[in-house]
């Protein structure tokens, strides 16, 4: 997971002020530091066939309410259906109310999540901008 976190942080650095430490390592995002301690966080390594393809962290907010805390698909697996399949599998694994958030700078993530959630819910979702882009739906 730590290696995937570094790839995630590298990818995310295009949109944020994430900086490398003097030894060339990105500092851990808060949810990554907490994944082994917080019982409300569920961590997944996404796979395409047998190869690691990314990661997901789901946070339980309340009984049957969830937030997609982190979601990352390696570049070589983007636009292959791997991310869509992983997102749908997570929605099925955790039925209930969901929120999925993206930072305003990450237009590709916004497009991905709108497309995936629209298809999964048949358009039955709400989107707000405060300042993050947030899709909310129940499945």
PLM segments and residue spans:
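Conserved beta-strand in the GNAT
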Residues: 43-45, 51-60, 67, 72
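Conserved beta-strand-loop-alpha-helix junction that forms the acyl-donor binding cleft
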Residues: 99-114, 118, 126-130, 137-138
């Amino acid at each position: 997971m730590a290696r995937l976190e570094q790839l995630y942080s590298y990818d995310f650095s295009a949109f944020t002020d994430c900086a490398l430490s003097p030894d060339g390592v990105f500092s851990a995002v808060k949810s990554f530091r907490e994944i082994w301690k917080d019982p409300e966080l569920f961590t997944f390594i996404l796979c395409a066939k047998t190869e690691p393809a990314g990661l997901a962290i789901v946070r339980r907010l309340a009984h049957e309410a969830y937030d997609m805390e982190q979601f990352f698909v390696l570049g070589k697996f983007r636009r292959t259906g791997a991310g869509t399949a992983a997102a749908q599998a997570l929605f099925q694994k955790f039925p209930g109310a969901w929120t999925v958030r993206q930072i305003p700078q990450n237009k590709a993530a916004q497009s991905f999540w709108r497309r995936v959630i629209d298809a999964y819910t048949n358009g039955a979702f709400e989107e707000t901008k405060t300042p993050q882009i947030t899709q909310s739906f129940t499945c």
